């Protein structure tokens, strides 16, 4: 089979005006970025259609390091729905350069289920990540200037919380000292970098309802504390307008197309392990405004991305999924059955059966939210029918819908079984009204423990002295009502990435809580999770090149 980039290159793309016309989106509203991409103004969102639309969430079991193909399934499902005569649009996150050149590679789908032009989408795209990075670091520069200019006055700060960001994986930037040199070079202090998808600006971009809401959220960003212990925000710095200007175009969703010319809105890119892991509310609303079905995904496993999608994004958006599709693969299931990562491609029915406990946990958890769940088996070319049957029979025994997705190899035709099952369930057995894992009035510790014990099956939750200190500051600022966004490893229900399967009864340690006042959530750091990833021994970057003007090795 051809490589992803070869397949993408062989597709004859339609001009973006044709894609817009296919969903009755007025062409004169488009703000083109070349021939095949356009920004769409927020005025195109139809709130009445948003409320009536069929939102489909795609999530997954706990993944292996290479992932389970959730984006490919999301795109494939949209292709499949269009293949059977339904009007479907997919809404996805934008890829980050960190993983693209790091371990996982790109995030534009795979095979014959991709969003295009994949090279542009995987690289700089429309500059949204650059805008977020620039806005974040502009705040840092202006904050540093404020500190410098007020170094000899009573207006100084006693504690600074705001870091810098870059869209790269670079472990050496996790901790840094700035302001070295002479006094004219700034005030020395210890700080660090996060990756751009973990930026509070990214979260704000993805949760904002409109430009006014974006600006309001920017004003509320907590930067540090004064010498009197009062919160110091972007509003106090007086720069919200300047930062909003940097994001005036980034807030608009991006319209592209798939390998079969299905419309796709690709916008925003927070990770689900260290942030809330969902594409923008505005892009999802745009998909609901123009499609009969809107397919979207939430990052990593359902314990992370789906929980945050339902508890944070849906609460903000006021819309819930009619159905949740849970992606599973033989490889990930065998990993949870005790097989080493290097051996998961080989047949092993016994390990597969053991690994089904991880699938069952995710199904059970999603049903707690009132979600109707079906399992999408993402097929690889090495998968054996006998082992696929084991998973199918198990799901049937659990009274859970099951469909094989082969969109990677066959495009929309390969997702026909999945698409038909989705339509059947939405029309006859849709999800119940959404049941949140916690309520806003619950104390912060109760919110954390409800997720830890009800979703992760932790035995107990312990707090570091640093986390306890943050809880006091949260109470002092009356921020207890905010939702919690758990930052932990994506490879296990626990904080130990090596603990596979249906792990239970463990201790979950809260090491820190980051107050995202602007985004409107509390980021709860579990264990030693890093908000600036590192690179593997052999990063994807060594395989990427440009030959005769064509990019090679991007996947």
UniProtKB/Swiss-Prot annotation:
EC number: 6.3.4.3
Pathway: One-carbon metabolism; tetrahydrofolate interconversion
Keywords assigned by UniProt, alphabetized: ATP-binding, Ligase, Nucleotide-binding, One-carbon metabolism
Top-tier EC class: ligase
Keyword set includes Secreted: no
Swiss-Prot/TrEMBL GO biological process terms: tetrahydrofolate interconversion
GO molecular function terms noted in the UniProt entry: ATP binding; formate-tetrahydrofolate ligase activity
Catalytic activity, as annotated: (6S)-5,6,7,8-tetrahydrofolate + formate + ATP = (6R)-10-formyltetrahydrofolate + ADP + phosphate
One Pfam family from the record: FTHFS
Similarity annotation: Belongs to the formate--tetrahydrofolate ligase family.
NCBIfam families named among the record's database cross-references: PRK13505.1 (NF010030)
Protein name per the record: Formate--tetrahydrofolate ligase
Organism, scientific name: Porphyromonas gingivalis (strain ATCC BAA-308 / W83)
């Amino acid at each position: 089979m051809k490589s992803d980039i070869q397949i993408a290159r062989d597709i004859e793309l339609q001009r973006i005006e044709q894609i817009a016309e296919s969903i009755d989106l007025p062409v004169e509203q488009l703000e083109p970025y070349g021939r095949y991409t356009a920004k769409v103004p927020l005025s195109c969102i139809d709130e009445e259609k948003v409320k009536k639309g069929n939102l489909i969430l795609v999530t997954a079991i706990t993944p292996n390091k290479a992932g389970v193909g959730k984006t490919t399934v999301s795109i494939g499902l949209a292709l499949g729905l269009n293949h059977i005569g339904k009007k479907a649009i997919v809404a996805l996150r934008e890829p980050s350069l960190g993983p693209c050149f790091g371990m996982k590679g790109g995030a534009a789908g795979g095979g014959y289920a991709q969003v295009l032009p994949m090279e542009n989408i995987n690289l700089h795209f429309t500059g949204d990540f650059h805008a977020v990075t620039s806005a974040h670091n502009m705040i840092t520069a202006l904050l540093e200037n404020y500190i410098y200019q007020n170094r000899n006055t009573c207006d100084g700060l006693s504690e600074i919380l705001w870091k810098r960001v870059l869209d790269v994986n670079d472990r050496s930037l996790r901790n840094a000292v700035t302001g070295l040199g002479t006094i004219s070079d700034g005030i020395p202090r210890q700080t660090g970098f996060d990756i751009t998808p973990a930026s509070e600006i990214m979260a704000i971009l993805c949760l904002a309802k409109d430009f006014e809401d974006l600006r309001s959220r920017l004003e509320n960003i907590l930067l540090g504390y004064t010498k009197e212990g009062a919160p110091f925000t972007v509003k106090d710095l007086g720069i919200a307008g300047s930062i909003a200007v940097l994001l005036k175009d980034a807030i608009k969703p991006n319209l592209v197309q798939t390998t079969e010319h299905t419309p796709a809105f690709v916008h925003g890119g927070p990770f689900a392990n260290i942030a809330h892991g969902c594409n923008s509310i505005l892009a999802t609303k745009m998909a609901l405004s123009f499609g009969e079905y809107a397919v979207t995904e939430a990052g990593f496993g359902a314990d992370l991305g789906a929980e945050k999608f339902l508890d944070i994004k849906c609460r903000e958006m006021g819309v819930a999924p009619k159905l949740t599709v849970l992606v599973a693969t033989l490889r990930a299931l065998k990993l949870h059955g005790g097989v080493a990562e290097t051996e998961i491609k080989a047949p092993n029915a016994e390990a597969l059966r053991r690994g089904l406990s991880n699938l069952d946990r995710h199904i059970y958890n999603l049903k707690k939210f009132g979600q109707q769940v079906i399992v999408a088996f993402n097929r690889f070319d090495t998968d054996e029918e006998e082992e696929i049957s084991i998973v199918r029979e198990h799901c049937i025994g659990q009274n859970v819908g099951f469909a094989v997705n082969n969109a990677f190899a066959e495009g929309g035709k390969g997702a026909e079984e999945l698409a038909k099952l989705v339509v059947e369930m939405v029309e006859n057995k849709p999800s119940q009204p959404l049941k949140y894992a916690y309520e806003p009035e619950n104390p912060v510790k109760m919110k954390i423990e409800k997720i830890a014990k009800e979703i992760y099956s932790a035995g107990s939750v312990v707090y570091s002295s640093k986390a306890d200190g943050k809880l006091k500051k949260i109470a002092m600022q009356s921020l207890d009502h905010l939702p919690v966004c758990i930052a932990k490893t994506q490879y296990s229900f626990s904080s130990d990435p090596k603990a596979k399967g249906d792990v239970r009864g463990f201790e979950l340690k809260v090491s820190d809580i980051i107050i995202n006042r602007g985004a409107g959530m509390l980021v709860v750091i579990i264990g030693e999770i890093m908000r600036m990833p590192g690179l593997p021994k052999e990063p994807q970057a060594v395989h990427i090149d440009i030959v005769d003007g064509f990019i090679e090795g991007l996947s």
